[in-house]
């Protein structure tokens, strides 16, 4: 329709030796807007890069986030919070490629999905054979606040080195009914109690 909007964006970040970069993305579009966001990050020795993605709106959002560790003593951090409802769809695809030894990466994505919302998390960590002493962490936690909401999560590890520390995991659940009851028993209305629990989870 005439009100539909489609955006295809590309961001490239080149972190030189010992550089420190913090990059924040806030996605809060109209329900008629679709976005494909492509972010590519190339890191050199000793660089530290953090990307924080907040996805709150839009009809369809696809985030492609790719880190390439082209050096040693590199630290890469990806954090994301998704809060959507209605028929919104947010799709996170992450890749961290550990190419050199003695590097770290941290991924922590959280999602809260309401009525008819759909979420996807597809995260991959690749550790090359030469990338010994790698420390890589990946976690995706989700709450479905409606029985019509869905989440598809797929954390992945491809490890070709033998001296590494790598972990990944995911959780899918609902709001804690006992915690909700406790807050209501202290005089907090149900709507506000639910909001407090979701805030605590996302925080």
Identify the role of each PLM range:
Residues 197-203:
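Short, surface-exposed loop/turn segments at secondary-structure boundaries that line and modulate
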Residues 1-181, 185-188, 202:
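Conserved beta-strand/loop scaffold segments within soluble protein domains that form the structured core
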């Amino acid at each position: 329709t005439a009100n539909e909007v489609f955006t295809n964006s590309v961001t490239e970040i080149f972190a030189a030796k010992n550089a420190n970069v913090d990059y924040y993305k806030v996605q809060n579009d109209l329900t008629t807007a679709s976005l494909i966001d492509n972010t590519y990050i190339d890191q050199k020795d000793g660089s530290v890069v953090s990307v924080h993605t907040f996805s709150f709106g839009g009809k369809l959002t696809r985030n492609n986030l790719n880190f390439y560790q082209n050096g040693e003593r590199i630290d890469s951090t990806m954090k994301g919070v998704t809060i959507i409802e209605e028929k919104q769809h947010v799709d996170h695809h992450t890749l961290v490629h550990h190419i050199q030894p003695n590097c770290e990466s941290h991924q922590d994505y959280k999602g809260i999905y309401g009525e008819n919302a759909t979420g996807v998390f597809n995260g991959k960590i690749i550790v090359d054979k030469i990338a010994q002493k790698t420390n890589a962490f990946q976690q995706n936690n989700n709450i479905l606040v409606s029985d019509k909401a869905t989440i598809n999560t797929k954390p992945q590890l491809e490890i070709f080195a033998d001296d590494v520390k790598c972990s990944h995991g995911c959780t899918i659940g609902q709001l804690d009914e006992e915690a909700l009851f406790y807050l209501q028993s202290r005089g907090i209305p149900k709507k506000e109690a639910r909001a407090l629990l979701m805030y605590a989870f996302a925080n």
